Protein backbone atom coordinates (compact mmCIF):
# COMPACT_ATOMS: atom_id res chain seq x y z
CA UNK A 1 0.00 0.00 0.00
CA UNK A 2 1.55 3.25 -1.14
CA UNK A 3 0.99 6.51 0.68
CA UNK A 4 0.80 9.66 -1.39
CA UNK A 5 3.37 11.92 0.25
CA UNK A 6 2.02 15.08 -1.38
CA UNK A 7 -1.41 14.58 0.17
CA UNK A 8 0.15 13.79 3.55
CA UNK A 9 2.27 16.94 3.37
CA UNK A 10 -0.77 19.06 2.51
CA UNK A 11 -2.79 17.66 5.41
CA UNK A 12 0.18 17.89 7.74
CA UNK A 13 0.76 21.56 6.94
CA UNK A 14 -2.95 22.31 7.39
CA UNK A 15 -3.11 20.59 10.78
CA UNK A 16 0.13 22.26 11.87
CA UNK A 17 -1.39 25.63 10.96
CA UNK A 18 -4.54 24.86 12.99
CA UNK A 19 -2.48 23.57 15.92
CA UNK A 20 -0.19 26.60 16.05
CA UNK A 21 -3.09 29.04 15.59
CA UNK A 22 -5.02 27.52 18.48
CA UNK A 23 -1.82 27.33 20.53
CA UNK A 24 -1.12 31.01 19.93
CA UNK A 25 -4.67 31.95 20.97
CA UNK A 26 -4.39 29.82 24.11
CA UNK A 27 -0.96 31.32 24.90
CA UNK A 28 -2.26 34.89 24.57
CA UNK A 29 -5.28 34.15 26.76
CA UNK A 30 -3.10 32.57 29.45
CA UNK A 31 -0.59 35.41 29.27
CA UNK A 32 -3.29 38.03 29.72
CA UNK A 33 -4.70 36.08 32.67
CA UNK A 34 -1.25 35.85 34.28
CA UNK A 35 -0.18 39.45 33.64
CA UNK A 36 -3.59 41.11 33.98
CA UNK A 37 -4.73 42.84 37.12
CA UNK A 38 -7.42 41.36 39.27
CA UNK A 39 -8.62 44.38 41.18
CA UNK A 40 -12.28 45.22 41.17
CA UNK A 41 -13.98 48.30 42.42
CA UNK A 42 -17.24 50.11 42.04
CA UNK A 43 -15.86 52.23 39.21
CA UNK A 44 -14.47 49.27 37.28
CA UNK A 45 -17.93 47.78 37.00
CA UNK A 46 -19.56 50.91 35.57
CA UNK A 47 -19.95 51.28 31.79
CA UNK A 48 -17.52 53.63 30.08
CA UNK A 49 -18.76 55.85 27.27
CA UNK A 50 -15.90 57.84 25.72
CA UNK A 51 -14.86 59.42 29.00
CA UNK A 52 -18.31 60.81 29.69
CA UNK A 53 -19.83 59.92 33.02
CA UNK A 54 -23.13 58.20 32.37
CA UNK A 55 -26.24 59.76 33.79
CA UNK A 56 -29.22 57.62 34.56
CA UNK A 57 -29.81 54.05 33.54
CA UNK A 58 -27.56 52.79 30.75
CA UNK A 59 -29.75 49.81 29.90
CA UNK A 60 -31.70 50.53 26.74
CA UNK A 61 -34.78 48.52 25.94
CA UNK A 62 -35.80 48.18 22.32
CA UNK A 63 -39.08 47.05 20.92
CA UNK A 64 -39.30 43.53 19.57
CA UNK A 65 -40.14 45.02 16.17
CA UNK A 66 -36.53 46.15 15.77
CA UNK A 67 -35.35 42.56 16.16
CA UNK A 68 -38.00 41.31 13.75
CA UNK A 69 -36.88 43.80 11.12
CA UNK A 70 -33.26 42.76 11.71
CA UNK A 71 -34.15 39.09 11.21
CA UNK A 72 -36.11 39.88 8.05
CA UNK A 73 -33.15 41.85 6.76
CA UNK A 74 -30.78 38.95 7.39
CA UNK A 75 -33.10 36.51 5.61
CA UNK A 76 -33.46 38.66 2.52
CA UNK A 77 -29.79 39.63 2.57
CA UNK A 78 -28.82 35.96 2.47
CA UNK A 79 -31.21 35.61 -0.45
CA UNK A 80 -29.30 38.33 -2.28
CA UNK A 81 -26.02 36.50 -1.62
CA UNK A 82 -27.39 33.24 -3.02
CA UNK A 83 -28.76 34.98 -6.09
CA UNK A 84 -25.43 36.76 -6.63
CA UNK A 85 -23.57 33.44 -6.50
CA UNK A 86 -26.09 32.01 -8.96
CA UNK A 87 -25.69 34.98 -11.32
CA UNK A 88 -21.91 34.56 -11.35
CA UNK A 89 -22.23 30.93 -12.45
CA UNK A 90 -25.22 31.34 -14.75
CA UNK A 91 -23.43 29.93 -17.80
CA UNK A 92 -22.49 26.71 -16.01
CA UNK A 93 -25.87 26.17 -14.35
CA UNK A 94 -28.01 26.54 -17.48
CA UNK A 95 -31.79 26.16 -17.46
CA UNK A 96 -31.79 23.85 -14.46
CA UNK A 97 -30.00 26.48 -12.40
CA UNK A 98 -32.38 29.13 -13.70
CA UNK A 99 -35.42 27.10 -12.67
CA UNK A 100 -33.91 26.49 -9.22
CA UNK A 101 -33.20 30.21 -8.77
CA UNK A 102 -36.72 31.00 -9.96
CA UNK A 103 -38.25 28.60 -7.43
CA UNK A 104 -36.01 30.07 -4.72
CA UNK A 105 -37.12 33.60 -5.59
CA UNK A 106 -40.79 32.59 -5.72
CA UNK A 107 -40.58 30.95 -2.30
CA UNK A 108 -38.99 34.08 -0.84
CA UNK A 109 -41.62 36.28 -2.47
CA UNK A 110 -44.31 34.08 -0.94
CA UNK A 111 -42.59 34.55 2.42
CA UNK A 112 -42.59 38.31 1.91
CA UNK A 113 -46.29 38.28 1.01
CA UNK A 114 -46.94 36.23 4.14
CA UNK A 115 -45.08 38.79 6.28
CA UNK A 116 -47.12 41.60 4.75
CA UNK A 117 -50.35 39.67 5.25
CA UNK A 118 -49.75 39.04 8.96
CA UNK A 119 -48.68 42.69 9.29
CA UNK A 120 -45.22 41.82 10.59
CA UNK A 121 -43.81 44.90 8.87
CA UNK A 122 -46.51 47.25 10.20
CA UNK A 123 -45.09 49.72 12.73
CA UNK A 124 -48.26 51.51 13.73
CA UNK A 125 -49.94 50.29 16.88
CA UNK A 126 -53.36 51.65 15.90
CA UNK A 127 -54.16 48.65 13.71
CA UNK A 128 -55.89 45.85 15.57
CA UNK A 129 -54.28 42.47 15.52
CA UNK A 130 -57.04 40.68 13.61
CA UNK A 131 -54.78 38.45 11.61
CA UNK A 132 -56.35 36.18 9.04
CA UNK A 133 -53.84 33.79 7.59
CA UNK A 134 -56.07 32.20 4.97
UniProtKB/Swiss-Prot annotation:
It catalyses: a quinone + NADH + 5 H(+)(in) = a quinol + NAD(+) + 4 H(+)(out). Pfam families: Oxidored_q4 (PF00507). The chain crosses the membrane at residues 14-34, 66-86, 96-116. It is a multi-pass membrane protein. The keyword Transmembrane applies. Keywords: Cell membrane, Membrane, NAD, Quinone, Translocase, Transmembrane, Transmembrane helix, Transport, Ubiquinone. One of its GO terms (molecular function) is NADH dehydrogenase (ubiquinone) activity. It is found in: Cell membrane. Signal peptide: none annotated. It is an enzyme of class 7 (translocase). GO terms for cellular component: NADH dehydrogenase complex; plasma membrane. Its EC number is 7.1.1.-. NDH-1 shuttles electrons from NADH, via FMN and iron-sulfur (Fe-S) centers, to quinones in the respiratory chain. The immediate electron acceptor for the enzyme in this species is believed to be ubiquinone. Couples the redox reaction to proton translocation (for every two electrons transferred, four hydrogen ions are translocated across the cytoplasmic membrane), and thus conserves the redox energy in a proton gradient. NDH-1 is composed of 13 different subunits. Subunits NuoA, H, J, K, L, M, N constitute the membrane sector of the complex. Belongs to the complex I subunit 3 family. This is NADH-quinone oxidoreductase subunit A. It comes from Buchnera aphidicola subsp. Acyrthosiphon pisum (strain APS).
Amino acid sequence: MLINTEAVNEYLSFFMFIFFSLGLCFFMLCLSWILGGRSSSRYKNTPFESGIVSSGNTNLYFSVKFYLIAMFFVVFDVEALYLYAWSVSIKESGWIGFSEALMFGISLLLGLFYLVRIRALNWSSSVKNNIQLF
